[in-house]
Amino acid sequence: MESSADRLARAAALGREHEVRALLEAGASPNAPNTFGRTPIQVMMMGNVKVAALLLSYGADSNCEDPTTLSRPVHDAAREGFLDTLVVLHQAGARLDVRDAWGRLPLDLALERGHHDVVRYLRYLLSSAGNVSRVTDRHNFCSSTPRCLGLRGQPPKQR
């Protein structure tokens, strides 16, 4: 018989919001690892903001890291270009200044994949938090000023 952790992880991975809700309401833990050691938020369908918000509202850990790659859900969302999911994760307390096992920030992954809206959002937040110099030095940007980064004090564009 399949465990509730496996059922919840599978439902989250497939983006089945109603099934995720039913399992959570029935008492399934949003942080219980499945058979493969992954939590629902780690395997969820990244483009499904409703599933992400639902898991987070039931207490899913937005900062859980993969034990092998050290990547977190924000790394996955940034890499795949899911700005809406990234915003929900960040609003739930996900850190944006964490590196994976290869030393990459979520910003690095968004840059590599050309997800410009995600890059703007992350640069804006990191500059607001005073983390731009650390990020810009690593990428050899011209300077750490918002003007140089093209932010000019503007919030990220909304979809």
Curated annotation (Swiss-Prot):
Localization: Cytoplasm; Nucleus
GO terms assigned for molecular function: cyclin-dependent protein serine/threonine kinase inhibitor activity; disordered domain specific binding; DNA-binding transcription factor binding; MDM2/MDM4 family protein binding; NF-kappaB binding; protein kinase binding; RNA polymerase II-specific DNA-binding transcription factor binding; SUMO transferase activity
PROSITE patterns, per the entry: ANK_REP_REGION
UniProt-listed InterPro entries: Ank_Repeat/CDKN_Inhibitor, Ankyrin_rpt, Ankyrin_rpt-contain_sf
Keyword Nucleus: yes
Transmembrane regions: none
Any one GO CC term of the record: cytoplasm
Post-translational modification note: Phosphorylation seems to increase interaction with CDK4.
Note: Down-regulated in a number of tumor cell lines in response to methylation of the CpG island in exon 1.
Function recorded in the entry: Acts as a negative regulator of the proliferation of normal cells by interacting strongly with CDK4 and CDK6. This inhibits their ability to interact with cyclins D and to phosphorylate the retinoblastoma protein.
Quaternary structure and interacting proteins, as annotated: Heterodimer with CDK4 or CDK6. Predominamt P16 complexes contained CDK6. Interacts with CDK4 (both 'T-172'-phosphorylated and non-phosphorylated forms); the interaction inhibits cyclin D-CDK4 kinase activity. Interacts with ISCO2.
Protein name according to UniProt: Cyclin-dependent kinase inhibitor 2A
Record organism: Rattus norvegicus (Rat)
